[in-house]
């Protein structure tokens, strides 16, 4: 129901052809319309366009069902009453006018197509014409469409006196016709009910249709409706300032889920604890940002200390005296230079790359490399201090070894998910084989895009790769999100973890909760009707589809592999979102972050923390051991 003038003004035929040929999700068509209208000063929501499109689908189904199932013999009398009986000149005139002003895609692709011949070629097309007349008549009084009235305005049609008579004839006949059996109301009344229930909200109108007409709608339409709700809500979140909502900590509870209730996110929770070896219960772990620590030691000892093997024995003696038995060195690995470049361009000239934006799992050369690590490790172990290291499984740095060698290993699209995205800034790649550009909004501090542009000079392919993201704030714009639905990715990450385990007896997994199956699906391949990272709902999966692609919990695979190949390794997971019990009891991590304690201490919610401890003890005291 897009006017021909709008098709032409916004060059939508080209957009539509691209959509069909590239199999892009339908929402991309509406994002293009919204973007092109917005560039002309008309603020339009792609989510609203999508909601209205689904409304049209529902309305067409209701009208078609009425004409074909309840009143299959009514059409000839209806056409006569409207003055457009088959074979009449009035039908030819009206059909020509209607298809000229509101052409279907058939007429856009083939402007020479004759409307009358097209309608005569298939008897059902007369029903479709009646349906469109009635639906446009309903739309004319829908105040929720005002933001994009230009797209569907039918005043041009009503200027034709004969067209006005046709519309009035259709409305008048159907008002006097038998009511829709299930509701006892006429067809025009039924179609206007959502407008009365929610005059100004397309979201609420479609919600009304879903809830009140549920028994009439085909089952396959419901996931599309739920997805439309999700996309609309996603748009609302995109324009809501972060931190504007009230933060609170939830009490940790157990046994509240049953399979098949609500969202299908229930996963079995068998008891599969991992046993500690003799030294693990006595670990007292001290964290040090390695570059900061070396700088502090340089001042303390009045020495130039830049390498791990230059750390004075006296400092290790002091740590041992304090009772430290584990030293977590943050920032050992080779970092992605793109991270530093982004920070410096954004106004922090002294910044270094993030410790969680990595190029590769090699000890940084300026720290002395692996050779210096082994010497320092030996000295520390003589004092009963084991070394710990981060492992960042969720993502790599924006510029990384895998981005160069395995660009297909990342969550990505062949097109930008939002048409307004532009990638014209500095190339952040240090390798001539590829170019990397983050979205211009980061440089201009006006947007936080979910993807960056990866151009491969070797084959000419452009990818739009998602930044790492846990959905709680803005994307991490110096990172690239790994795709764990790819078996080779899971195998490669497990291999990297074993590499780390050969060097460090204690491993701390960064953002481990993001890779639990329920959360990885929620974020990147959400179930129909549920949101995740912006633009990902249109790439969602059912639970069964996701389970087929990722049959096992990744962390259970990791724990089992470590148990056989590196059994004397202590595994520590950063697992928030009330996942502590699951990570320890079912996935087999030795230790896990106590996010409940951290958040409740900060918010001074002592009663909640006491209740959390009680709940854990009642469920399984071993979780706390």
Regions found by a protein language model. Name each.
Residues 334-387:
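Aromatic-lined substrate-binding rim segments of carbohydrate-active enzymes
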Residues 328-330, 388-392, 510-512, 572-574:
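A cross-family glycoside hydrolase active-site/sugar-binding cleft signature
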Residues 324, 358, 386-388, 479, ...:
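Extracellular structured ligand-interaction cores
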Residues 1-305, 364-377, 382-383, 397-625:
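Alpha-amylase-like alpha-glycosidases and glucanotransferases acting on alpha-linked glucans and related
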Residues 334-335, 394-395, 578:
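Solvent-exposed loop/turn segments at secondary-structure junctions
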Residues 311-345, 499-508:
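Catalytic domains of carbohydrate-active enzymes, especially glycoside hydrolases
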């Amino acid at each position: 129901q897009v006017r021909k003038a709008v098709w032409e003004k916004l060059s939508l035929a080209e957009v539509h052809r691209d959509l069909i040929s590239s199999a892009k999700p339908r929402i991309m068509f509406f994002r293009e319309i919204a973007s092109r209208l917005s560039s002309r000063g008309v603020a339009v929501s792609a989510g609203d366009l999508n909601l209205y499109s689904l409304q049209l689908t529902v309305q067409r189904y209701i009208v078609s069902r009425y004409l074909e199932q309840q009143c299959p013999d009514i059409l000839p009398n209806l056409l006569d009453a409207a003055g457009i009986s088959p074979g009449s000149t009035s039908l030819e005139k009206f059909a020509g006018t209607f298809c000229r002003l509101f052409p279907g895609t058939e007429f856009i692709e083939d402007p020479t197509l004759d409307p009358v011949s097209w309608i005569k070629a298939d008897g059902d097309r007369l029903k479709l014409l009646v349906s469109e007349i009635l639906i446009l008549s309903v739309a004319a009084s829908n105040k929720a469409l005002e933001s994009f009235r230009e797209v569907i305005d039918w005043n041009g049609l009503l200027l034709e006196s004969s067209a006005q008579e046709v519309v009035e004839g259709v409305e008048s006949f159907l008002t006097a016709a038998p009511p829709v059996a299930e509701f006892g109301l006429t067809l025009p009344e039924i179609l206007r009910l959502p407008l009365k229930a929610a005059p100004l909200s397309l979201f609420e109108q479609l919600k009304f249709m879903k809830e009140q007409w549920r028994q009439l709608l085909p089952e396959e339409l419901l996931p599309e409706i739920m997805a439309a709700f999700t996309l609309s809500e996603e748009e609302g979140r995109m324009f809501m300032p972060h931190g504007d909502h009230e933060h609170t900590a939830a009490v940790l509870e157990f046994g509240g889920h049953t399979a098949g209730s609500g969202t299908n996110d229930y996963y079995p929770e068998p008891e599969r604890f991992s046993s500690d070896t003799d030294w693990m219960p006595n670990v007292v772990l001290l964290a040090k940002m390695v570059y900061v620590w070396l700088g502090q030691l340089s001042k303390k000892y009045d020495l130039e200390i830049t390498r791990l093997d230059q750390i004075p024995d006296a400092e290790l003696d002091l740590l041992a005296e304090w009772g430290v038995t584990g030293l977590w060195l943050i920032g050992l690995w080779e970092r992605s230079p793109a991270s530093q470049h982004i920070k410096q361009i954004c106004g922090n000239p002294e910044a270094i790359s993030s410790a969680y934006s990595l190029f590769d799992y090699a000890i940084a050369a300026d720290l002395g490399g692996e050779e210096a690590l082994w010497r320092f490790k030996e000295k520390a172990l003589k004092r009963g201090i084991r070394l710990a290291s981060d492992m960042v499984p969720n993502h790599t740095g924006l510029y990384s070894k895998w981005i160069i060698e395995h660009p297909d290993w990342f969550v990505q699209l062949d097109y930008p998910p939002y048409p307004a995205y532009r990638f014209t800034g500095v190339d952040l790649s240090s390798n001539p084989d590829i170019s990397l550009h983050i979205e211009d909004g980061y440089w201009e501090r006006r947007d936080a895009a979910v993807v960056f542009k990866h151009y491969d000079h070797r084959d000419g392919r452009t990818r739009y790769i998602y930044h790492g993201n846990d959905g709680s704030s803005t994307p991490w714009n110096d990172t690239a999100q790994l795709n764990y639905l790819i078996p080779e990715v899971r195998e490669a990450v497990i291999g990297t973890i074993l590499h780390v385990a050969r060097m460090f007896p204690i491993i701390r997994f960064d953002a481990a909760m993001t890779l639990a199956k329920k959360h990885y699906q929620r974020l990147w391949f959400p179930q129909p009707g549920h949101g995740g990272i912006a633009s990902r709902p249109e790439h969602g999966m059912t639970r069964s589809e996701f389970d087929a692609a990722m049959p096992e919990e990744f962390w259970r695979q990791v724990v089992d592999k470590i148990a056989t190949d590196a059994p004397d390794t202590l595994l520590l997971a950063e697992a928030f979102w009330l996942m502590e019990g699951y990570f320890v009891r079912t996935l087999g991590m030795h230790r896990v972050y106590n996010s409940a304690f951290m958040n409740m201490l900060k918010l001074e919610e002592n009663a909640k923390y006491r209740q959390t401890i009680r709940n854990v003890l009642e469920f399984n005291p071993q979780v706390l051991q």
